[in-house]
Amino acid sequence: MTNKKAFKEACKFIAGGVNSPVRAFANVQSEPKFISHGKGAYIFDIDGNSYIDYVQSWGPLLFGHCDKDIQKACQKALHKGSSFGAPTLLETELAKLVLSDFPHLEKIRFVSSGTEATMSAIRLARGFTKKDKILKFEGCYHGHSDSLLVSAGSGAATFNSPSSLGVLEDVAKHTLVAKYNDINSVKELFEKNKDIACVIIEPIAGNMGLVPAKQDFLEELAKICKNNQTLLIFDEVMSGYRASYLGSYGINHIQADIITFGKVIGGGLPAAAFASRAEIMDILSPLGGVYQAGTLSGNPLAMAAGIASLTKAKKKTKLYDKLGKLAKKLTQGMKKLADEKGLPLQACHVGSMFGYFFTKDPVSNYQDALKSDLALFSKFHKNMLENGIYLAPSQFETGFICSKMDDKIIDTTLEAVRESFKRI
Protein backbone atom coordinates (compact mmCIF):
# COMPACT_ATOMS: atom_id res chain seq x y z
CA MET A 1 0.00 0.00 0.00
CA THR A 2 1.24 3.52 -0.82
CA ASN A 3 1.17 6.60 1.42
CA LYS A 4 -1.61 8.08 -0.69
CA LYS A 5 -3.79 4.98 -0.52
CA ALA A 6 -3.11 4.53 3.18
CA PHE A 7 -4.27 8.07 3.95
CA LYS A 8 -7.37 7.65 1.81
CA GLU A 9 -8.27 4.48 3.69
CA ALA A 10 -7.49 6.04 7.08
CA CYS A 11 -9.88 8.90 6.31
CA LYS A 12 -12.70 6.38 5.98
CA PHE A 13 -12.29 5.14 9.53
CA ILE A 14 -10.37 7.78 11.51
CA ALA A 15 -11.65 11.34 11.86
CA GLY A 16 -9.49 13.41 9.52
CA GLY A 17 -7.37 10.35 8.87
CA VAL A 18 -5.11 11.12 11.83
CA ASN A 19 -5.22 11.06 15.62
CA SER A 20 -3.66 14.50 16.08
CA PRO A 21 -4.42 17.33 13.61
CA VAL A 22 -0.92 18.49 12.65
CA ARG A 23 -0.06 15.01 11.38
CA ALA A 24 -2.43 15.49 8.43
CA PHE A 25 0.06 17.84 6.69
CA ALA A 26 -2.82 20.24 5.93
CA ASN A 27 -0.67 23.22 6.94
CA VAL A 28 1.72 22.46 4.09
CA GLN A 29 -0.99 21.58 1.55
CA SER A 30 0.12 17.97 1.37
CA GLU A 31 -0.68 14.52 2.72
CA PRO A 32 1.07 12.61 5.51
CA LYS A 33 3.71 9.94 5.18
CA PHE A 34 2.76 6.65 6.82
CA ILE A 35 5.74 5.43 8.80
CA SER A 36 6.68 1.76 8.81
CA HIS A 37 9.58 1.95 11.25
CA GLY A 38 12.36 4.07 12.67
CA LYS A 39 16.02 3.54 13.51
CA GLY A 40 18.27 6.04 15.23
CA ALA A 41 17.95 9.40 13.49
CA TYR A 42 15.89 7.99 10.61
CA ILE A 43 12.30 7.05 9.84
CA PHE A 44 11.05 5.02 6.89
CA ASP A 45 7.67 5.31 5.17
CA ILE A 46 5.60 2.55 3.59
CA ASP A 47 6.72 3.65 0.11
CA GLY A 48 10.27 2.70 1.08
CA ASN A 49 11.60 6.25 1.50
CA SER A 50 13.97 7.13 4.32
CA TYR A 51 14.17 10.49 6.08
CA ILE A 52 16.39 12.20 8.61
CA ASP A 53 13.81 12.77 11.33
CA TYR A 54 13.78 16.15 13.07
CA VAL A 55 10.31 15.61 14.54
CA GLN A 56 11.39 12.72 16.79
CA SER A 57 7.77 11.97 17.74
CA TRP A 58 7.40 15.69 18.65
CA GLY A 59 10.22 15.61 21.17
CA PRO A 60 10.21 12.48 23.36
CA LEU A 61 12.94 10.58 21.53
CA LEU A 62 16.08 12.14 22.99
CA PHE A 63 17.99 9.00 22.02
CA GLY A 64 16.33 8.51 18.65
CA HIS A 65 14.25 5.60 17.42
CA CYS A 66 14.65 2.08 18.81
CA ASP A 67 17.23 2.94 21.47
CA LYS A 68 18.50 -0.41 22.78
CA ASP A 69 18.59 0.59 26.45
CA ILE A 70 15.02 1.88 26.44
CA GLN A 71 13.81 -1.13 24.46
CA LYS A 72 15.49 -3.49 26.93
CA ALA A 73 13.86 -1.73 29.90
CA CYS A 74 10.43 -1.92 28.25
CA GLN A 75 10.83 -5.59 27.38
CA LYS A 76 11.80 -6.40 30.96
CA ALA A 77 8.76 -4.56 32.31
CA LEU A 78 6.39 -6.07 29.74
CA HIS A 79 7.52 -9.56 30.68
CA LYS A 80 6.12 -8.91 34.18
CA GLY A 81 2.86 -7.31 33.03
CA SER A 82 1.77 -4.24 31.07
CA SER A 83 -0.50 -2.63 33.68
CA PHE A 84 -1.84 -3.42 37.13
CA GLY A 85 -3.82 -0.39 38.26
CA ALA A 86 -1.80 -0.66 41.46
CA PRO A 87 1.44 0.88 42.76
CA THR A 88 4.79 -0.47 41.55
CA LEU A 89 8.35 0.21 42.64
CA LEU A 90 9.06 1.73 39.24
CA GLU A 91 6.82 4.73 40.02
CA THR A 92 8.77 5.60 43.14
CA GLU A 93 12.07 5.07 41.35
CA LEU A 94 11.18 7.52 38.58
CA ALA A 95 9.76 9.99 41.11
CA LYS A 96 13.01 9.99 43.08
CA LEU A 97 15.01 10.34 39.87
CA VAL A 98 13.09 13.45 38.82
CA LEU A 99 12.87 15.13 42.22
CA SER A 100 16.53 14.58 43.12
CA ASP A 101 17.65 17.31 40.72
CA PHE A 102 15.06 19.96 41.60
CA PRO A 103 15.56 21.30 45.14
CA HIS A 104 12.25 23.18 45.11
CA LEU A 105 10.15 20.16 44.10
CA GLU A 106 9.21 17.71 46.85
CA LYS A 107 6.46 15.52 45.43
CA ILE A 108 5.24 14.44 42.02
CA ARG A 109 2.20 12.81 40.42
CA PHE A 110 2.39 10.85 37.17
CA VAL A 111 -0.23 10.99 34.42
CA SER A 112 -0.36 9.76 30.82
CA SER A 113 -0.20 12.95 28.73
CA GLY A 114 0.94 16.55 28.78
CA THR A 115 -2.68 17.67 28.56
CA GLU A 116 -3.46 15.77 31.77
CA ALA A 117 -0.42 17.27 33.47
CA THR A 118 -1.31 20.90 32.73
CA MET A 119 -5.02 20.34 33.34
CA SER A 120 -4.25 18.81 36.73
CA ALA A 121 -1.76 21.57 37.58
CA ILE A 122 -4.41 24.21 36.90
CA ARG A 123 -6.95 22.43 39.10
CA LEU A 124 -4.34 22.02 41.81
CA ALA A 125 -3.46 25.73 41.71
CA ARG A 126 -7.11 26.73 41.96
CA GLY A 127 -7.66 24.35 44.84
CA PHE A 128 -4.62 25.63 46.72
CA THR A 129 -5.20 29.37 46.20
CA LYS A 130 -9.03 29.28 46.32
CA LYS A 131 -8.98 31.60 43.28
CA ASP A 132 -10.73 31.16 39.94
CA LYS A 133 -8.87 32.83 37.09
CA ILE A 134 -5.79 31.62 35.26
CA LEU A 135 -3.38 33.59 33.10
CA LYS A 136 -1.70 32.13 30.04
CA PHE A 137 0.24 33.63 27.14
CA GLU A 138 -0.70 34.13 23.53
CA GLY A 139 0.86 31.44 21.38
CA CYS A 140 1.67 29.07 24.26
CA TYR A 141 0.04 25.65 23.96
CA HIS A 142 -0.68 23.63 27.08
CA GLY A 143 -2.71 20.76 25.71
CA HIS A 144 -6.35 20.61 24.71
CA SER A 145 -8.22 20.94 28.00
CA ASP A 146 -11.07 23.46 27.83
CA SER A 147 -9.67 26.23 30.01
CA LEU A 148 -6.41 26.33 28.06
CA LEU A 149 -7.87 26.33 24.53
CA VAL A 150 -8.19 30.08 24.56
CA SER A 151 -6.48 32.67 22.34
CA ALA A 152 -5.88 36.40 22.82
CA GLY A 153 -9.02 37.45 20.97
CA SER A 154 -9.55 41.19 21.07
CA GLY A 155 -6.61 41.94 23.32
CA ALA A 156 -4.51 40.85 26.26
CA ALA A 157 -6.41 42.94 28.80
CA THR A 158 -9.82 41.37 28.11
CA PHE A 159 -11.56 38.10 28.75
CA ASN A 160 -11.22 35.75 25.84
CA SER A 161 -13.29 33.57 23.58
CA PRO A 162 -12.76 29.86 22.99
CA SER A 163 -10.48 28.87 20.13
CA SER A 164 -12.30 25.56 19.65
CA LEU A 165 -15.93 24.65 19.17
CA GLY A 166 -17.27 22.91 22.23
CA VAL A 167 -15.42 25.10 24.72
CA LEU A 168 -17.98 27.10 26.68
CA GLU A 169 -17.77 30.87 27.03
CA ASP A 170 -18.43 30.36 30.74
CA VAL A 171 -15.20 28.35 30.92
CA ALA A 172 -13.13 30.61 28.68
CA LYS A 173 -14.07 33.75 30.58
CA HIS A 174 -11.89 32.64 33.50
CA THR A 175 -8.79 32.48 31.29
CA LEU A 176 -6.78 35.66 30.79
CA VAL A 177 -4.23 35.98 28.00
CA ALA A 178 -1.09 38.14 28.11
CA LYS A 179 1.52 38.85 25.46
CA TYR A 180 4.60 36.62 25.61
CA ASN A 181 7.78 38.44 26.68
CA ASP A 182 5.73 41.57 27.51
CA ILE A 183 5.66 42.14 31.27
CA ASN A 184 3.45 45.23 30.96
CA SER A 185 0.60 43.14 29.57
CA VAL A 186 0.93 40.91 32.63
CA LYS A 187 0.87 43.88 35.02
CA GLU A 188 -2.28 45.25 33.36
CA LEU A 189 -4.11 41.98 33.89
CA PHE A 190 -3.06 41.75 37.55
CA GLU A 191 -4.19 45.34 38.14
CA LYS A 192 -7.67 44.50 36.85
CA ASN A 193 -7.98 41.00 38.33
CA LYS A 194 -7.33 40.13 41.97
CA ASP A 195 -8.38 36.49 41.78
CA ILE A 196 -5.69 34.96 39.55
CA ALA A 197 -4.91 31.48 40.85
CA CYS A 198 -1.95 30.80 38.61
CA VAL A 199 0.13 31.90 35.67
CA ILE A 200 1.04 29.10 33.28
CA ILE A 201 3.78 29.61 30.70
CA GLU A 202 6.13 27.70 28.45
CA PRO A 203 9.43 29.25 29.62
CA ILE A 204 10.79 28.06 26.30
CA ALA A 205 7.83 28.27 23.97
CA GLY A 206 7.77 25.50 21.40
CA ASN A 207 4.29 25.74 19.98
CA MET A 208 4.51 29.04 18.13
CA GLY A 209 7.77 27.87 16.69
CA LEU A 210 10.71 28.07 19.09
CA VAL A 211 10.58 31.32 21.07
CA PRO A 212 12.50 31.46 24.38
CA ALA A 213 11.25 33.73 27.14
CA LYS A 214 13.68 36.48 28.12
CA GLN A 215 15.43 36.12 31.48
CA ASP A 216 14.34 39.51 32.84
CA PHE A 217 10.76 38.82 31.75
CA LEU A 218 10.66 35.52 33.65
CA GLU A 219 12.28 37.03 36.73
CA GLU A 220 9.74 39.86 36.84
CA LEU A 221 6.91 37.40 36.21
CA ALA A 222 8.02 35.32 39.20
CA LYS A 223 8.05 38.44 41.40
CA ILE A 224 4.56 39.45 40.32
CA CYS A 225 3.23 35.99 41.09
CA LYS A 226 4.85 35.94 44.53
CA ASN A 227 3.55 39.40 45.41
CA ASN A 228 0.00 38.43 44.44
CA GLN A 229 -0.06 34.96 46.06
CA THR A 230 -0.43 33.49 42.59
CA LEU A 231 1.22 30.19 41.70
CA LEU A 232 3.67 30.16 38.80
CA ILE A 233 3.46 27.08 36.60
CA PHE A 234 6.25 26.28 34.16
CA ASP A 235 4.98 24.01 31.42
CA GLU A 236 8.09 21.98 30.58
CA VAL A 237 6.31 19.15 28.80
CA MET A 238 8.42 19.96 25.75
CA SER A 239 11.49 21.71 27.16
CA GLY A 240 12.04 19.41 30.14
CA TYR A 241 15.16 17.27 29.59
CA ARG A 242 15.39 18.86 26.12
CA ALA A 243 16.63 22.42 26.60
CA SER A 244 19.05 20.99 29.17
CA TYR A 245 18.92 18.04 31.53
CA LEU A 246 17.00 20.29 33.94
CA GLY A 247 14.96 21.92 31.20
CA SER A 248 14.56 25.67 31.51
CA TYR A 249 15.51 25.51 35.20
CA GLY A 250 19.02 24.54 34.15
CA ILE A 251 19.17 27.77 32.13
CA ASN A 252 17.15 30.44 33.95
CA HIS A 253 17.37 28.98 37.53
CA ILE A 254 13.89 30.26 38.35
CA GLN A 255 11.97 28.10 40.82
CA ALA A 256 8.40 27.85 39.59
CA ASP A 257 5.76 26.71 42.09
CA ILE A 258 4.62 23.86 39.84
CA ILE A 259 6.40 22.23 36.89
CA THR A 260 4.76 19.97 34.34
CA PHE A 261 6.81 17.34 32.54
CA GLY A 262 6.16 15.08 29.56
CA LYS A 263 7.64 13.70 26.35
CA VAL A 264 11.24 12.76 27.33
CA ILE A 265 10.10 11.75 30.82
CA GLY A 266 8.31 8.79 29.22
CA GLY A 267 11.12 7.78 26.90
CA GLY A 268 8.71 7.57 23.96
CA LEU A 269 5.80 6.02 25.84
CA PRO A 270 2.73 7.89 27.15
CA ALA A 271 3.84 9.52 30.39
CA ALA A 272 3.80 12.98 31.92
CA ALA A 273 3.85 14.47 35.40
CA PHE A 274 3.37 17.55 37.55
CA ALA A 275 5.41 18.34 40.63
CA SER A 276 5.54 20.95 43.38
CA ARG A 277 6.37 21.43 47.04
CA ALA A 278 4.67 19.15 49.56
CA GLU A 279 2.15 21.65 50.94
CA ILE A 280 0.67 22.05 47.46
CA MET A 281 0.85 18.42 46.33
CA ASP A 282 -0.66 17.15 49.58
CA ILE A 283 -4.06 18.67 48.79
CA LEU A 284 -4.41 16.09 46.01
CA SER A 285 -6.76 13.19 46.70
CA PRO A 286 -6.54 10.91 48.67
CA LEU A 287 -4.89 13.34 51.11
CA GLY A 288 -6.90 16.41 50.13
CA GLY A 289 -9.87 17.64 48.16
CA VAL A 290 -8.36 18.13 44.68
CA TYR A 291 -9.25 15.11 42.60
CA GLN A 292 -7.05 13.60 39.88
CA ALA A 293 -6.93 10.01 38.67
CA GLY A 294 -6.05 7.82 35.69
CA THR A 295 -6.30 4.14 34.81
CA LEU A 296 -2.88 4.03 33.15
CA SER A 297 -1.17 6.73 35.21
CA GLY A 298 2.24 5.45 36.26
CA ASN A 299 1.91 2.27 34.21
CA PRO A 300 5.05 0.09 34.43
CA LEU A 301 5.97 0.23 30.74
CA ALA A 302 6.06 4.03 30.67
CA MET A 303 7.83 4.20 34.03
CA ALA A 304 10.49 1.75 32.85
CA ALA A 305 11.04 3.71 29.65
CA GLY A 306 11.23 6.96 31.60
CA ILE A 307 13.76 5.59 34.07
CA ALA A 308 15.94 4.28 31.25
CA SER A 309 15.70 7.57 29.34
CA LEU A 310 16.49 9.89 32.26
CA THR A 311 19.17 7.63 33.74
CA LYS A 312 20.94 7.52 30.40
CA ALA A 313 20.62 11.29 29.94
CA LYS A 314 22.02 11.95 33.41
CA LYS A 315 25.01 9.64 32.94
CA LYS A 316 26.01 11.09 29.58
CA THR A 317 27.39 14.37 30.92
CA LYS A 318 28.49 15.64 27.50
CA LEU A 319 25.25 14.71 25.74
CA TYR A 320 23.62 18.13 25.95
CA ASP A 321 26.77 19.92 24.82
CA LYS A 322 26.85 17.70 21.76
CA LEU A 323 23.17 18.21 20.96
CA GLY A 324 23.46 21.95 21.45
CA LYS A 325 26.46 22.18 19.13
CA LEU A 326 24.63 20.24 16.42
CA ALA A 327 21.53 22.43 16.77
CA LYS A 328 23.71 25.54 16.59
CA LYS A 329 25.48 24.27 13.48
CA LEU A 330 22.14 23.53 11.82
CA THR A 331 20.47 26.86 12.60
CA GLN A 332 23.52 28.97 11.81
CA GLY A 333 23.99 27.04 8.59
CA MET A 334 20.37 27.60 7.59
CA LYS A 335 20.67 31.32 8.31
CA LYS A 336 23.86 31.61 6.26
CA LEU A 337 22.33 29.80 3.28
CA ALA A 338 19.20 31.95 3.48
CA ASP A 339 21.27 35.13 3.53
CA GLU A 340 23.23 33.96 0.49
CA LYS A 341 19.96 33.33 -1.33
CA GLY A 342 18.41 36.60 -0.17
CA LEU A 343 15.63 34.86 1.75
CA PRO A 344 14.25 36.27 5.02
CA LEU A 345 15.00 33.78 7.80
CA GLN A 346 15.27 33.84 11.57
CA ALA A 347 16.65 30.68 13.20
CA CYS A 348 17.54 29.81 16.79
CA HIS A 349 18.11 26.89 19.12
CA VAL A 350 17.96 26.13 22.85
CA GLY A 351 19.76 22.93 23.71
CA SER A 352 18.50 20.21 21.39
CA MET A 353 15.46 22.26 20.31
CA PHE A 354 15.52 24.44 17.20
CA GLY A 355 13.18 26.62 15.19
CA TYR A 356 13.10 28.91 12.19
CA PHE A 357 10.80 31.53 10.69
CA PHE A 358 10.66 32.96 7.20
CA THR A 359 10.67 36.59 8.31
CA LYS A 360 13.29 39.34 8.36
CA ASP A 361 12.48 40.51 11.88
CA PRO A 362 13.43 38.83 15.18
CA VAL A 363 10.67 36.76 16.79
CA SER A 364 9.92 37.25 20.48
CA ASN A 365 6.17 36.59 20.66
CA TYR A 366 3.23 35.07 18.81
CA GLN A 367 2.44 38.17 16.77
CA ASP A 368 6.04 38.22 15.52
CA ALA A 369 5.74 34.53 14.64
CA LEU A 370 2.61 35.19 12.60
CA LYS A 371 4.65 37.42 10.30
CA SER A 372 6.44 34.36 8.95
CA ASP A 373 5.79 33.71 5.25
CA LEU A 374 3.68 30.55 5.39
CA ALA A 375 3.70 30.05 1.62
CA LEU A 376 7.49 30.12 1.69
CA PHE A 377 7.52 27.68 4.60
CA SER A 378 5.20 25.31 2.73
CA LYS A 379 7.45 25.29 -0.35
CA PHE A 380 10.53 24.77 1.81
CA HIS A 381 8.93 21.91 3.71
CA LYS A 382 7.93 20.15 0.48
CA ASN A 383 11.41 20.56 -0.98
CA MET A 384 13.09 19.25 2.17
CA LEU A 385 10.81 16.22 2.29
CA GLU A 386 11.69 15.41 -1.31
CA ASN A 387 15.35 15.67 -0.28
CA GLY A 388 14.90 13.15 2.53
CA ILE A 389 14.51 15.55 5.47
CA TYR A 390 11.46 15.13 7.71
CA LEU A 391 10.57 18.43 9.39
CA ALA A 392 7.45 19.34 11.36
CA PRO A 393 4.65 20.09 8.86
CA SER A 394 3.80 23.38 10.53
CA GLN A 395 5.59 26.70 10.88
CA PHE A 396 4.49 26.82 14.51
CA GLU A 397 6.26 23.72 15.78
CA THR A 398 9.76 23.01 17.07
CA GLY A 399 12.42 20.69 15.66
CA PHE A 400 14.55 18.29 17.71
CA ILE A 401 18.07 16.90 17.59
CA CYS A 402 18.59 13.36 18.91
CA SER A 403 21.71 11.65 20.22
CA LYS A 404 22.02 9.49 17.09
CA MET A 405 22.68 12.57 14.95
CA ASP A 406 26.19 13.77 14.12
CA ASP A 407 28.04 16.32 12.00
CA LYS A 408 27.58 14.20 8.89
CA ILE A 409 23.80 14.22 9.30
CA ILE A 410 23.79 17.98 9.83
CA ASP A 411 25.97 18.44 6.72
CA THR A 412 23.54 16.30 4.71
CA THR A 413 20.66 18.37 6.03
CA LEU A 414 22.32 21.67 5.15
CA GLU A 415 22.99 20.43 1.63
CA ALA A 416 19.28 19.66 1.39
CA VAL A 417 18.55 23.18 2.66
CA ARG A 418 20.81 24.60 -0.06
CA GLU A 419 18.99 22.61 -2.76
CA SER A 420 15.59 23.48 -1.32
CA PHE A 421 16.37 27.20 -1.28
CA LYS A 422 17.44 26.98 -4.93
CA ARG A 423 14.00 25.69 -5.87
CA ILE A 424 12.04 28.35 -4.00
Curated annotation (Swiss-Prot):
Keywords: Cytoplasm, Isomerase, Porphyrin biosynthesis, Pyridoxal phosphate. Its EC number is 5.4.3.8. One of its GO terms (biological process) is protoporphyrinogen IX biosynthetic process. GO terms for cellular component: cytoplasm. GO terms for molecular function: glutamate-1-semialdehyde 2,1-aminomutase activity; pyridoxal phosphate binding; transaminase activity. It is an enzyme of class 5 (isomerase). It catalyses: (S)-4-amino-5-oxopentanoate = 5-aminolevulinate. It is found in: Cytoplasm. Signal peptide: none annotated. PANTHER family: GLUTAMATE-1-SEMIALDEHYDE 2,1-AMINOMUTASE (PTHR43713), GLUTAMATE-1-SEMIALDEHYDE 2,1-AMINOMUTASE 1, CHLOROPLASTIC-RELATED (PTHR43713:SF3). Homodimer. Belongs to the class-III pyridoxal-phosphate-dependent aminotransferase family. HemL subfamily. HAMAP family: HemL_aminotrans_3. This is Glutamate-1-semialdehyde 2,1-aminomutase. It comes from Campylobacter jejuni subsp. jejuni serotype O:6 (strain 81116 / NCTC 11828).
